[in-house]
């Protein structure tokens, strides 16, 4: 292998440094539809399988509109179990838990079709349908309802109050009870939050989403140039609270109305609302938002500096190909060699910097390409016009 480090003089060595600017950078280059569908199918497979393990039988809730359908499934399952209704409760529970999410998404598909893009909506429709069908079928694997990575979250060790709740199909644990269950549920939330962030980032890179309220988050993010991670965290929290109240707070309280116990566990009391299920799902949502911003920094602004000998050629190429970067150019003098070098400076989005690097390397393989993250920016930037957007701004200001 040829050594790219070249000795210049004495102990001075020119060292070649290189690094990927974007996480999952290779996925950004997938433009063929069949490859995008393959990636979405793989993600949907694991989303459905792990959703059964980490959410359906743990008492946690998923993100977005899914949490509401999950809450309804748990509410219906509670009434069937508590009233001893002679129906196939497992099928009803699984169908509501997974398949109603597809129906709930219909208004959002219409919104996305007209407000975002047809391709985005169709890819999202594909992912929502496939992932929920995978989850529905995986929920029928024999014994999966009693498969836990850590402690068993449904078996009561002390009987009495906790056993009464579990017998009626309510997935709820309390702070005063088994610490083993609390720690297990905490790990479930942290792991699933991280995995969702990875899956979700890949889905967004392909230009799709998980459906539901994601359409609103994506639309607002595009319209206001806001980071999508924080927006997701907010809307997911609101939808989760609704699902939690329906599927856990209400069902848990109704299940013990006839039970005479201590004052800490009165129906509709604080213990039923501020449970580990609530706290750890909120924590999971925070992990999801933070890691989504990390893996998919769509609106992270950076300052790019390019030092090279062919800056004029790079400038002409960018202008001829309508690459809307606002450019500042000047000549600098090396402090050691006193040689003149040209410098190109621009402020842009991080995901655009990767494309800019490709353009620079077409004309100057030895140019120094430097990126500095910008925490605050006040002014305007250029962004290439698309079918969904209009051009923004006239010049950079940082």
From Swiss-Prot:
Transmembrane segments: 37-57, 92-112, 122-142, 186-206, 228-248, 268-288
Subcellular location, record wording: Cell membrane
Source superkingdom: Bacteria
Stored Pfam families: DUF2179 (PF10035), YitT_membrane (PF02588)
InterPro entries: DUF2179, N-reg_PII/ATP_PRibTrfase_C, UPF0750_membrane, YitT
Membrane topology: Multi-pass membrane protein
GO CC list: plasma membrane
Name of protein: Uncharacterized protein MG432
Organism encoding this protein: Mycoplasma genitalium (strain ATCC 33530 / DSM 19775 / NCTC 10195 / G37)
């Amino acid at each position: 292998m040829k050594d790219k480090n070249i000795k210049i003089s004495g102990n001075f060595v020119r060292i070649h440094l290189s690094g990927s600017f974007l996480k999952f950078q290779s996925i950004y280059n997938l433009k063929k539809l069949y490859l995008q569908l393959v990636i979405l199918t793989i993600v949907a497979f694991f989303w459905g399988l792990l959703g059964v393990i980490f959410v359906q039988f743990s008492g946690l809730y998923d993100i977005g509109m899914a949490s509401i359908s999950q809450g309804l499934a748990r509410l219906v399952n509670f009434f069937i179990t508590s009233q001893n209704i002679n129906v196939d409760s497992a099928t009803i529970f699984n169908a509501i838990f997974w398949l109603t999410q597809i129906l709930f998404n219909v208004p959002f598909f219409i919104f996305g079709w007209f407000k975002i893009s047809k391709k985005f909506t169709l890819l999202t429709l594909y992912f929502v349908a496939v992932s929920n069908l995978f989850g529905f079928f995986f929920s029928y694997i024999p014994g999966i309802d009693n498969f836990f990575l850590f402690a068993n979250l449904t078996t009561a060790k002390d009987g009495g109050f906790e056993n009464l709740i579990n017998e009626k199909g309510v997935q709820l644990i309390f702070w005063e009870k088994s610490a083993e269950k609390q720690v297990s549920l905490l790990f479930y939330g942290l792991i699933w939050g991280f995995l969702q962030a990875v899956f979700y980032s890949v889905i967004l890179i392909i230009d799709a989403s998980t459906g539901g309220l994601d359409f609103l988050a994506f639309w607002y993010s595009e319209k206001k140039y806001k980071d999508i991670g924080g927006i997701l965290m907010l809307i997911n929290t609101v939808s989760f609270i609704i699902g939690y109240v329906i599927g856990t707070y209400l069902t848990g309280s109704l299940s013990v109305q006839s039970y005479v116990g201590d004052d800490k566990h009165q129906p509709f009391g604080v213990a039923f609302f501020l449970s580990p299920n609530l706290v750890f799902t909120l924590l999971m949502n925070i992990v999801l938002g933070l890691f989504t911003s990390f893996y998919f920094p769509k609106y992270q602004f950076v300052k790019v500096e390019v030092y090279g000998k062919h800056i004029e050629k790079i400038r002409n190429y960018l202008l001829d190909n309508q690459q809307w970067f606002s450019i500042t150019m000047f000549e600098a003098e090396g402090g050691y060699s006193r040689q003149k070098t040209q410098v190109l400076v621009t402020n842009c989005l991080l995901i655009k910097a990767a494309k800019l690097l490709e353009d620079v390397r077409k004309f100057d393989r030895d140019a120094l390409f430097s990126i500095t993250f910008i925490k605050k920016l006040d002014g305007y930037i250029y962004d290439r016009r698309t079918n969904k957007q209009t051009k923004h701004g006239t010049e950079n200001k940082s």
